[in-house]
Each structure stands twice: as structure tokens, then as C-alpha cells.
Swiss-Prot record:
Gene: HBQ1
Coiled-coil stretches: none
Family under the similarity heading: Belongs to the globin family.
Amino-acid positions noted as binding heme b in the UniProt annotation, renumbered to this chain: 59, 88
Location of the Globin domain: 2-142
Species in which this protein is naturally found: Papio anubis
Protein name: Hemoglobin subunit theta-1
Superkingdom in the source lineage: Eukaryota
Length: 142
């Protein structure tokens, strides 16, 4: 899904506001994922998953760095995220079906308009994670 110039500008403006806190927010999102979806912990059994652990913060920073790369290269997300997609699909054997993209906000959602306007950007990034069978010969979900 191609993003409009307005969508790209909106995503970049938000990212600029997040500034140096992107790693903190990504870590918090990771911790919330572990709480809301405990099954995701199986992919991180080698880490200390206690809130605020150095290992969770380090992985949160990796997520933040990947998202920052995506924001820098919004015009070419497939190429920007291809190495990351290959790593997760072929080496780590992560099934993208376990990590669905966030759905749209309901029409009457009382939250501010900004998150709704950013949905195309989030969907654009999530949509760049190809099916493992498209990347890796013989892929099977463990």
C-alpha cells in the first residue's frame, strides 16, 4: 500500500516529536505485548522478560531502530525492511500470523484524530512483512 505524501509527512512529524524517546516507547510496547499476549513470550525465552530488564530494553531499542529505518525510507518500505523480514521469517522462524497488524479504530472512537490518520503508516509497515513461505524454502511453523 503506497502512502500519500500527506501520510508520509504525518508519520515523519510524529516520529520527530518522539525524538530520542522512541526506544523507551518501543520497550513499553514490547512489555505490554508480553502482558496482553503471553504466548509471544515463547519467542523470547532466552531473555529476562521482567519489566525494565536490560534485555527487554535492548530489544525495544532494536525495534525502535527498525521503525526509525522504516520512517526514513517510507517511499521504499519493502527494500528497507527486507533484511528484517528475512531474519524473522527464515532464521527466527516467527510466523507473522502471530503478530497481526493493529486494526482500524472504530468510527466513533473518542481518541484524537492523529492516531486514525497514522493508520495508513502503521498498516504500511505491517504490510511489508511477507509470508515466510515467500521468503524461505521449506518454511514450517515450529
Amino acid at each position: 500500500m503506497a502512502l500519500s505524501a500527506e501520510d508520509r509527512a504525518l508519520v515523519r512529524a510524529l516520529w520527530k516529536k518522539l525524538g530520542s524517546n522512541v526506544g523507551v516507547y518501543a520497550t513499553e510496547a514490547l512489555e505490554r505485548t508480553f502482558l496482553a499476549f503471553p504466548a509471544t513470550k515463547t519467542y523470547f525465552s532466552h531473555l529476562d522478560l521482567s519489566p525494565g530488564s536490560a534485555q527487554v530494553r535492548a530489544h525495544g531499542q532494536k525495534v525502535a531502530d527498525a521503525l526509525s529505518l522504516a520512517v526514513e525510507r517510507l517511499d521504499d518500505l519493502p527494500r528497507a525492511l527486507s533484511a528484517l523480514s528475512h531474519l524473522h521469517a527464515c532464521q527466527l522462524r516467527v510466523d507473522p500470523a502471530n503478530f497481526p497488524a493493529p486494526g482500524p479504530l472504530p468510527a466513533g472512537d473518542p481518541r484524537p484524530a492523529l492516531p486514525r490518520r497514522l493508520q495508513p503508516g502503521a498498516a504500511g509497515v505491517a504490510g511489508q512483512v511477507p509470508e515466510p513461505r515467500d521468503l524461505c524454502a521449506g518454511f514450517r511453523v515450529p
